[in-house]
A protein has these predicted regions:
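Selective detector of the "anchor" transmembrane alpha-helix that sits immediately C-terminal
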Residues: 231-251
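A conserved amphipathic terminal alpha-helix motif
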Residues: 181, 185-230
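Short acidic N-proximal helix/loop "leader" segments that mark the beginning
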Residues: 16-59
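N-terminal Lys/Arg-rich, disordered targeting/topogenic segments
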Residues: 1-7
């Protein structure tokens, strides 16, 4: 009986911490990343492709200014795709999902413009049953590339994904990326919506922002060393590993609050490091502190008298 109450309390505490982190994300981080880099005017105005998906349930508009001619930016946009130049994002993460992507660091010669109805591959056609693609719906060369997104090869479209390049003079351009998804009038699917909010949306933002930065780096000819992306992702993986270790420790150790404290710290790091993307030195220091705290979290003694956080000893 005492053990059952103890374990139930520990599970409730962990779920409470997860709910608190999710609440912080939904209240503060999600509204920010849904319009990362975009002005009020850019968020409000129509962009190419909006007409293909009216009345969406969700709209995200992100933007970045690139110090390169619009023609140069477009050249990198039009070779997006696993079948062309990749997505200029976290190649290592993409290939963990069997995408078989190799990001190009140079413009590929003699690429034709995309045509409506063409598949733009997100992963190799040989992976994921050949379903990892979006369909080109509109292509205005030099200006806009709009795709229809699908869940599976035979499924109806679920939204649009648009890339718009606007000149800001001879040597600068604005890249806008807009996603429109779902139907506002559709009946809610709460389980899928929760997954979309807490898993797909933040993951999509992290990858899409890196793609936009990757386009800017290539157009401006200032590519960072390849190890930086790997090191950045490694700090997130370290935070995830510490989160799992602390969670298991909190579930199975009844004596001390330290695993709960480390679980909260690792959860906050896993929430903030990929989303806010601080300088690599800051991310590395945070990850190192979390890893160093793992032995500390396993320490501590049971409080005298039989009562400690996460453990209730019933009287004999």
């Amino acid at each position: 009986m005492g053990l059952l109450v103890s374990r139930a309390l520990r599970i409730a505490l962990l779920l409470g911490l997860v709910a608190a982190l999710a609440g912080i994300y939904l209240a503060f981080l999600r509204p920010w990343h849904a319009r990362w880099g975009a002005s009020d005017g850019e968020v409000a105005r129509a962009l190419p492709g909006d007409e293909l998906w009216p009345d969406p349930a969700r709209v995200e508009t992100r933007a970045i200014t690139i110090s390169a001619p619009a023609e140069e930016v477009w050249a990198w946009v039009r070779q997006l795709g696993q079948d062309r130049g990749g997505f200029y994002s976290y190649e290592w993460l993409e290939n963990l999902a069997r995408a078989r992507i190799r990001n190009a660091d140079r413009l590929l010669p003699d690429l034709p413009e995309r045509t409506p109805g063409e598949k733009l591959w997100l992963a190799s056609p040989e992976e994921w049953g050949g379903t990892a693609f979006v369909l080109v719906a509109r292509n205005d060369p030099g200006r806009a590339l709009v795709t229809l997104t699908h869940v599976g090869a035979d499924e109806a479209p679920v939204g649009t994904w648009a890339f718009v390049v606007e000149p800001l003079g001879p040597d600068r351009a604005r890249l806008l990326v807009r996603s429109r998804a779902g139907r506002a009038a559709a009946p809610p699917r709460h389980g899928w919506r929760l997954f979309d909010l807490l898993v797909f949306e933040p993951a999509h933002f992290v990858m899409e922002r890196r793609m936009m930065l990757g386009i800017a780096e290539r157009a401006e000819r200032r590519l960072p060393p390849g190890w930086r992306n790997v090191a950045e992702v490694a700090t997130w993986m370290a935070a995830l590993a510490v989160l799992l270790a602390a969670g298991l420790s909190a579930l199975w150790r009844r004596a001390h609050p330290r695993p709960f404290l480390l679980f909260a710290a690792a959860g906050a790091a896993l929430l903030l490091l990929p989303t806010l993307r601080p300088p690599l030195a800051v991310s590395a220091a945070a990850a190192a502190l979390l890893v160093a705290a793992v032995p500390w979290s396993f320490g501590g003694r049971r409080a005298p008298g039989g009562l400690a956080l996460g453990h209730v000893r019933l009287p004999r």
